[in-house]
Design a protein with these regions (language model features):
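Generic enzyme active-site microenvironment
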Residues: 19, 191-192
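Short, flexible hinge/linker loops that cap or flank conserved catalytic cores
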Residues: 183-185
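N-terminal segments that mediate ammonia production and transfer
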Residues: 1-132, 140-181
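Structural motif
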Residues: 124, 188-190
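Secondary-structure boundary/capping motif
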Residues: 114, 187-188
Length: 192
């Protein structure tokens, strides 16, 4: 019995198994590719390799892939669905689909909602790239404030939010982002 949030794969001599936790906290997807099957945490990974018949594996289910094909088996009874909110706002790529929704569209709608709930008198809307870009665009669309870049991201620095300590997070952010000070100076800026 496994308690907690997980999506996992197990490879045996006769089959490949994919298991999603009963809450659906972490995503897991299945698709057909080159006459076989592929499993990934996000739909975008399957799209990239040309997979078809892409589907999300339901919470609590086990997929068994063997020479006869792929079967969805009963696993743990599904609990109350509880996908991690960080999948929508941070972890998932914008071109992935979670719970039938394109992440890019979800993030833009969150930005529009943020603009409705927290309007601002500003000259520019900018994002902390890359996860917040779609939300910042949504904020700009809803508010009528122009969107522009204000931070340049060092693409060689990995995720900073998930570092184990504040010191490492702060050091990572300092290396990862550089503001366009000349463009921002004297402006009232909404940072999403």
């Amino acid at each position: 019995k496994a308690l907690g949030a997980y999506s996992l794969t197990i490879l045996t001599r006769g089959a490949l198994y994919a298991v999603r936790d009963p809450w659906g906290f972490r995503p897991l997807t299945l698709g057909r590719v080159n006459g076989g099957w592929a499993i990934a945490s996000e739909t975008c990974a399957l799209q990239t390799i040309g997979a078809t018949e892409i589907q999300e594996i339901p919470a609590g289910k086990i997929v068994m892939v063997n020479d006869e094909g792929a079967q969805i088996l009963e696993g743990a009874p599904m609990a109350r669905p509880n996908l991690c909110i960080f999948e929508y706002i941070y972890f998932a790529r914008p071109d992935s689909v979670l719970d039938g929704q394109l992440i890019q569209e979800v993030r833009q709608e969150l930005g529009r909602q943020l603009a409705r709930e927290h309007p601002a008198d500003a000259d520019l809307v900018m994002s902390v790239p890359d996860s917040a870009t779609a939300a910042a665009v949504g904020y700009a669309q809803e508010s009528g404030i122009p969107y522009g870049e204000g931070l340049i991201k060092n693409r060689y620095i990995g995720r900073t939010f998930i570092q184990p300590s504040d010191r490492l997070r702060q050091a990572g952010v300092a290396l990862k982002f550089n503001p366009l000070a000349q463009l921002l100076q004297g402006k009232r800026v909404v940072v999403v």
